[in-house]
């Protein structure tokens, strides 16, 4: 599939030049940093960061999946609920069940283990997949290219857009814009394992006002190659091996 025709322009921050979509006025949105509370999530974050433990790709993928499961549970609190009568062997029970029609949107390839964790909990959700990758112009200059999209209609649904690393925010932004070609969701939640503060600031000015952002951790800076510091490295390579 040909690359999506999404408007981009040159963007520079901290001495790094990117290509990004046009800026808007910053706005308020709900941002949840799960690492602000001490939970078992901290163990899984520590292991995916650890240079010795992360070499075990099977364990790395499983830890990302576990983080996805925990985040899915937390994000389920943002959904709308309705009362449903359930017949038991001994009578009728009234349960509150999610009323939202959820679509799990994932950015390939690094997002697959995180997607699996979310899908373990949102097992009735439809799924959307977007390919977004960095096309380098020089060592410190790149554009994000979106070349593939498979998605159901999104009108009136709740979109959970998951990506393990929110470094610059550009991939998530362009992936979201690609998904909008399939309709406008009623609610959007952006979920990541680790975000940079720069990416959070970027999302504030590029996503709709009512977007909710969930992060397992937020790190302070990007390095000269636009990788999160301290971060964990390249999540896609750690999951699936180095790419050429």
Predicted regions, residues:
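PRPP-associated nucleotide enzymes
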Residues: 4-7, 16-18, 22-244
């Amino acid at each position: 599939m040909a690359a999506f025709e999404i408007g981009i322009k040159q963007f520079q921050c901290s001495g790094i030049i990117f290509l990004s979509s046009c800026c808007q006025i910053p706005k308020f949105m709900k941002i949840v940093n799960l690492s602000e509370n001490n939970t078992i999530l901290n163990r899984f974050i520590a292991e995916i960061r650890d240079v010795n433990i992360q070499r075990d790709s099977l364990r790395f993928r499983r830890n990302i999946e576990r983080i996805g499961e925990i985040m899915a549970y937390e994000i389920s609190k943002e959904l709308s609920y309705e009362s449903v009568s359930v017949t038991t062997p001994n009578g009728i029970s009234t349960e509150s069940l999610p009323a939202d029609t959820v679509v799990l949107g994932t950015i390939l390839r690094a997002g697959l283990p995180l997607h699996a964790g979310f899908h373990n909990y949102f097992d009735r959700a439809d799924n959307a997949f977007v390919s977004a990758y960095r096309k380098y112009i020089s060592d410190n200059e790149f554009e994000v290219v979106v070349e593939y999209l498979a998605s159901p209609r999104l009108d009136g649904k709740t979109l959970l857009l998951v990506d393990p690393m929110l470094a610059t925010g550009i991939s998530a932004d362009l992936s979201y814009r690609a998904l909008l070609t399939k309709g406008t969701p009623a609610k959007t939640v952006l979920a990541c394992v680790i975000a940079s503060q720069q990416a959070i600031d970027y999302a504030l000015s590029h996503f709709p006002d009512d977007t909710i952002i969930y992060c397992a951790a937020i790190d302070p800076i990007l390095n000269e190659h636009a990788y999160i510091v301290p971060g964990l490295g390249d999540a896609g390579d750690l999951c699936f091996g180095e790419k050429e």
